[in-house]
Curated annotation (Swiss-Prot):
The keyword Cytoplasm applies. Belongs to the methyltransferase superfamily. Tam family. Keywords: Cytoplasm, Methyltransferase, S-adenosyl-L-methionine, Transferase. It is found in: Cytoplasm. It comes from the Bacteria. This is Trans-aconitate 2-methyltransferase. It comes from Mycobacterium sp. (strain KMS). Gene3D superfamilies: S-adenosyl-L-methionine-dependent methyltransferases, Vaccinia Virus protein VP39.
């Protein structure tokens, strides 16, 4: 279950890659703009402000996120991106920090690119930090007793969860697009107590939370804190620097 409040606790940090992605989309007057994986809708609203004449359509597979987006006035639909297809008037498709949850997303990108009209825009951003110390710490703890029997069948994502920018560029170039692909490592400056734990609670730890009782969850988090504090030490001035790699692709159909 997605928790919109937990996700929004780092809204400024999580939002920056969205704006960096959107800045490379050159559509002037799109008819329909689609946000795949809209979350609580706080960034979908930005699309509506940029293109006020467009129909802005949003999708998410979390009922909680869809409800939060609708409270912001977003035309949010409940559904899986795997089953989504563009309408004839779709000119911009944007997916921010969603497709990493979909193993077959390279095939989806190819299919969407082929279904969009010439001159349309397809843009996405995905985290590229699955081998980061934060994820490694979660996996190490989950392999220990008493957690291993409870969490053994969670498919913790390791290895090549997302492609490299060059791989995405090749994929969409072969699909007939002109492609702008890059990666950025953001150094987030965090100041709260145990900030990395709070950050991953809203994202990477969701599968763990769903398997544990409230008491177990509190204990798991307590045991995770020293591992994360060792990997991301708090500076003398109270700040913690949290590197976060992200991969971007903006394609225009031919």
């Amino acid at each position: 279950m997605w928790n919109p409040e937990a996700y929004l606790s780092f809204a400024d940090h999580r939002g920056r890659p969205f704006f960096d992605l959107l800045a490379r989309v050159g559509a002037d007057a799109p008819r329909r703009v689609v946000d795949l994986g809209c979350g609580p809708g706080n960034l979908t609203v930005v699309l509506r402000h940029r293109w006020p004449e467009a129909v802005v359509e949003a999708w998410d597979n979390s009922p909680e996120m869809v409800a939060a987006a609708r409270e912001r006035g977003v035309q949010a639909n409940l559904g899986d991106v795997r089953g989504w297809s563009p309408q004839p008037d779709t000119d911009v498709v944007l997916s921010n920090a969603t497709l990493q949850w979909v193993p077959e997303h390279p095939e989806l990108l190819t299919r969407w690119a082929g279904a969009l009209a010439a001159g349309s825009w397809l843009a996405m951003q995905v985290p590229g930090n699955f081998d980061a110390p934060s994820h490694q710490a979660v996996r190490r703890l989950a392999d220990r007793e008493p957690w291993a029997p409870l969490l053994h069948d969670i498919p913790f994502r390791v290895g090549k969860v997302v492609e490299t920018p060059a791989d995405y560029a090749a994929l969409l170039t072969d699909a007939g697009c002109s492609v702008d692909a890059w990666e950025t490592t953001y150094i987030h400056e965090l100041t709260d107590a145990h900030p990395v734990l709070e950050w991953i609670t809203g994202t990477a730890l969701r599968p763990v939370r769903s398997r544990l009782t409230d008491e177990q969850w509190d204990r798991f988090r307590a045991e995770l804190i020293p591992l994360l504090d060792e990997a991301y030490p708090v500076r003398a001035d109270g700040r913690t620097f949290f590197p976060f790699r992200r991969v971007f692709v903006v394609a225009r159909t031919g």
